[in-house]
Amino acid sequence: MEAAARRRQHPGAAGGAGAQPGASFLQARHSSGKADEAVGTAPFHLDLWFYFTLQNWVLDFGRPIAMLVFPLEWFPLNKPSVGDYFHMAYNIITPFLLLKLIERSPRTLPRSVIYVSIITFVMGASIHLVGDSVNHRLLFSGYQHHLSVRENPIIKNLSPETLIDSFELLYYYDEYLGHCMWYVPFFLILFIYFSGCFTPTKAESSMPGAALLLAMPSGLYYWYLVTEGQIFILFIFTFFAMLALVLHQKRKRLFLDSNGLFLFYSFALTLLLVALWVAWLWNDPVLRKKYPGVIYVPEPWAFYTLHVSSRP
């Protein structure tokens, strides 16, 4: 009788090993969902965003500049250049900072997608490292970025002609395959992180002064990334996906937190700068020839070799 009474008072204990195997799993998933809803808004990650912007400017934007500034005697053409070492550091530091951003997200994000994206990012950036290293070394031999591979004076007369095919393959790895495997996972990770940057409290949807100041160099760097990387389609798709997500979440009375606003405003500034850049060079006949088609977004280094370095 006492045992029966105890079983009636604690029905869960009576189930013991006979309880449904999925019950605890469903309960855990339900608890995890509740925890995501109840979690507070993350503060602005000033340290991570500052390091992220700084290393982008120094290790990515500054990479080709360092290759031109440092004496050639220090880094012979048959050895890695200072820009190559910058690129190696970028390939290590950037994935690390992206993972730290994901760790600080107040929401549970798809880890498997993040890990596969990071692996693909590192592989694509490493492919680009090799191709970009050779292409920038060709500048010292008279290679002109505003011309196609076959139209370049130092390449078009190579013999046998199959050598030209090899240089075109190198260009393909650098500008197409490397960029695709580098930038697609990069923007995918940023978008996944952005999807977790929403708060139910409108008062928390604001940016501190430091974030506003940091958004300007961040947006300017993404302008360089979009134009030099020739990824305008990928960028505009990501930006409009972010905009659509903001409008969708607004219906649920969810608003961007400071980190989401920082990323969104940085991309908005980038879009404005790209539009101004294209408008400025819209009627350039030489660049128009290199970038035919509907989408015309000249590369900054093509502009440099055409209008700056070619001056007497």
UniProtKB/Swiss-Prot annotation:
Keyword Transferase: no
Record flagged with keyword Endoplasmic reticulum: yes
Membrane topology: Multi-pass membrane protein
Positions with biased composition (Basic residues): 1-10
GO biological process: cholesterol metabolic process; ganglioside metabolic process; glycosaminoglycan metabolic process; locomotion involved in locomotory behavior; lysosomal lumen acidification; macromolecule catabolic process; positive regulation of proteolysis; visual perception
Membrane spanning stretches: 57-77, 82-102, 112-132, 178-198, 205-225, 226-246, 261-281
Region described as Disordered: spans on this chain: 1-22
Pfam families: CLN6
GO cellular component, one term: endoplasmic reticulum lumen
Matching InterPro entries: CLN6
Keywords from the named record: Endoplasmic reticulum, Membrane, Transmembrane, Transmembrane helix
Entry's Gene Ontology molecular function annotations: lysophosphatidic acid binding; protein homodimerization activity; sulfatide binding
Subunit record text: Interacts with CRMP2. Interacts with CLN5. Interacts with CLN5. Interacts with CLN3.
Name of the protein in its database record: Ceroid-lipofuscinosis neuronal protein 6 homolog
Lineage of producing organism: Eukaryota, Metazoa, Chordata, Craniata, Vertebrata
